[in-house]
From Swiss-Prot:
SUPFAM superfamilies: QueA-like
Protein name, per record: S-adenosylmethionine:tRNA ribosyltransferase-isomerase
Gene: queA
Organism classification: Bacteria, Pseudomonadati, Pseudomonadota, Alphaproteobacteria, Hyphomicrobiales
GO molecular function per UniProt: S-adenosylmethionine:tRNA ribosyltransferase-isomerase activity
Pathway the protein contributes to: tRNA modification; tRNA-queuosine biosynthesis
Function per UniProt: Transfers and isomerizes the ribose moiety from AdoMet to the 7-aminomethyl group of 7-deazaguanine (preQ1-tRNA) to give epoxyqueuosine (oQ-tRNA).
Organism annotation: Methylobacterium radiotolerans (strain ATCC 27329 / DSM 1819 / JCM 2831 / NBRC 15690 / NCIMB 10815 / 0-1)
Length: 354
């Protein structure tokens, strides 16, 4: 499909630079294809679902994956270099995006304070592979000491990261470190809202997908067939898969909290829609025409024009439905992107394609 089909005009004033306070106070647009749009709030979510539905949360935790350092070569002046870690390949090894990547070659040493890495490989689009001088928990501690929180560029380009972001940019249930971007739909959920979900008879389950920096990358291809997704590591354990299968068999709906949870569930889905345990990388790229097998509803934020995430929601609820929903959201003053408002999406009879 042509990528320009997923373009739309978004005023700069629609971009949220801070989250709602408290975090469950954001607005929520309910989108049911073929029905009128409904303006609600995130706190209304328990009433918008029904007892027996199962919400699936991504419990990944954001690490301070942005490292600023210096390239060192014998006899050459140091070159300031920024890297964004995005995929761990071994206890001592990470894939990363570097700036300026064009000045790096295999064998270069990078120093980040007390931490040193060697460039093992230089790939396309600014991607490199780094081998660090320590591994495992020792490397994790060094990254935590030297790294910075990787706020999305559309926020970081407008203001500096500060102490508030250390809390605001983590979900309250984050427990498995490894993401370099937050699963932002989950940022809306407070402990009080989670308790309200429980009281309403809704199930809560957790999966893990370590969100990579590829989520920030623009789609540069003119056609979706020309875009490659970067791999992200995910885990759906057997007990959770069994519980979700049982919930659906009993008439409950599977509600993915965020596109990351949805992508993992669809990666783990069998042809009949049941879930199998999953552990490993996924590069699933969902565009209109995709047939969803495992997910019945989706809680998600409002996404960038021409992004893979807007393509995903267009596949889920229909491209024209989402065009209309986003036009309504912009006109009604909804806040967009990571710190913005939420939507609750339901699928149409089948996703539409131009």
């Amino acid at each position: 499909m042509r990528v320009d089909l997923f373009d739309f005009e978004l005023p700069e004033t629609s971009i949220a630079l801070r989250p709602a306070e408290p975090r469950d106070a954001g607005r929520m647009l309910v989108v049911r294809p073929g029905a009128p749009l409904v303006d609600r709030t995130v706190r209304d979510l328990p009433d918008a679902l029904r007892a027996g539905d199962a919400l699936v949360f991504n419990d990944t935790r954001v690490i301070p994956a942005r490292l600023n350092g210096v390239r060192t070569r014998p006899g050459a002046p140091g070159q300031r270099t920024e890297v964004m870690l995005h995929l761990r390949e071994a206890p001592d090894r990470w894939r990363a995006f570097a700036r300026p990547a064009k000045r790096l070659t295999a064998g270069d040493a990078l120093r980040f304070g007390d931490l040193t890495a060697t460039v093992l490989e230089k790939a396309e689009a600014g991607e490199i592979v780094l081998a660090f001088d320590r591994a495992g928990p020792e490397l994790d501690a060094a990254i935590a000491a030297e790294g910075a929180l990787p706020l999305p560029p559309y926020i970081a380009g407008k203001r500096a990261t500060d102490a508030r972001d250390a809390t605001d940019y983590q979900t309250v249930y984050a427990r498995n470190p490894g993401a370099v971007a937050a699963p932002t739909a989950g940022l809306h959920f407070s402990d009080a809202l989670l308790a309200d979900l429980d009281a309403a008879g809704l199930q809560r389950h957790h999966v893990t997908l370590h969100v990579g920096a590829g989520t920030f990358l623009p789609v540069k291809a003119e056609d979706t067939d020309g875009h490659r997704m970067h791999a992200e590591i995910g885990i759906l354990d057997a007990a959770t898969a069994d519980a979700l299968n049982a919930a659906r068999a009993a008439g409950g709906r599977i509600v993915a909290v965020g596109t990351t949870a949805l992508r993992l569930l669809e990666s783990a889905a069998r042809p009949d829609g049941t879930l199998a345990p999953f552990s490993g990388p996924t590069e699933i790229f969902i565009t209109p025409g995709y047939r969803f097998r495992a997910v019945d509803a989706l809680v998600t934020n409002f996404h960038l024009p021409r992004s893979t995430l807007f393509m995903l929601v267009s596949a889920f609820s229909g491209l024209e439905t989402m065009r209309a929903a986003y036009a309504h959201a912009i006109g009604a003053g909804y806040r967009f992107y990571s710190y913005g408002d939420a939507s609750l999406l339901f699928p149409g009879p089948r996703a539409d394609t131009p």
